[in-house]
Amino acid sequence: AWAQFQDAQSVYTASLAMLLVLYGVAAALNLFIQGSGKVYAPMPWNFMSICQGFWQDFKSLWTDPLGSISLSVTTLFWGVGATLQLLVLSWAQEKLLLNLSQAAYLQAATAVGVIAGAALAARWVALHQATWVLGLGLAMGALLPIMLWVTQWQTAVLLTTLLGLVGGFFVVPMNALLQHRGVVLLSAGRSIAIQNVNENASILAMMAAYSGLLYFHAKVEDLILVLALLMITVMARVLWRHLLLRTPSA
């Protein structure tokens, strides 16, 4: 038993070390990003002034037509994505009869799909075309219920990879558009602060809702359908608003 514990500890230590190395590499790569040349006025260090400034920035980004669309999408995506990571584990164990380690490979398949989708979006979608991918949000929501009919792990790998691919291709242009509007309206750092608050609030809210549904013994099938319905409903509203903004008034 002690030997097994030591082996497990070695695996955890190695995993943590690998994560630290990756974070270090990411931090080092930031050193090679060229500065924009812009010089911003110093920010006040008074707490109330900081809060008031943050609230003004928050409203500026949410009231901007393109800013609100891209912020809505990225906020939704990260909340759904975090919930989906846990849901995939439960689904794989209950419906595919995989153990936890095997189920984690489906999370890896999703990550591979996201990376591939992000790379394709960076190659094929220009900034002025960013809103063209909004329909993929509906597609992602429509793909989720397919999980209910999957019974083989091979099919599950293909489906989770496809979900990641669609998600990566969908969110990267939206994130680029959000960063662009943030720089135009505010500054890079201030817009990222607004984005992080919204996305983390979305993750917390959806994790709380997911935990609450589990507490009341909701079935995996019901959780999948709720997540799909949320994705489709929000994206339909975002698309409708975007179409209204594009349609010239009479």
Locate each region found by the language model.
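C-terminal ends and interior cores of transmembrane alpha-helices
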Residues: 138-152
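Helix-loop junctions on the cytosolic side of multi-pass membrane transporters
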Residues: 12, 16-46, 239-249
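Conserved glycine-rich helix-kink/hinge and helix-boundary motifs of the Major Facilitator Superfamily
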Residues: 71-72, 104, 134, 189-193
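Juxtamembrane intracellular "pre-TM" segments in multi-pass secondary transporters
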Residues: 35-72
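Helix-to-loop junctions at the C-terminal end of transmembrane segments
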Residues: 3, 116-130, 214
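Transmembrane alpha-helix termini and helix-breaking/packing motifs in multi-pass membrane transporters
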Residues: 1-19, 90, 94-96, 204-227
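Substrate-agnostic recognition of the 12-TM MFS/MFS-like secondary transporter fold
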Residues: 1-3, 69, 77-85, 110, ...
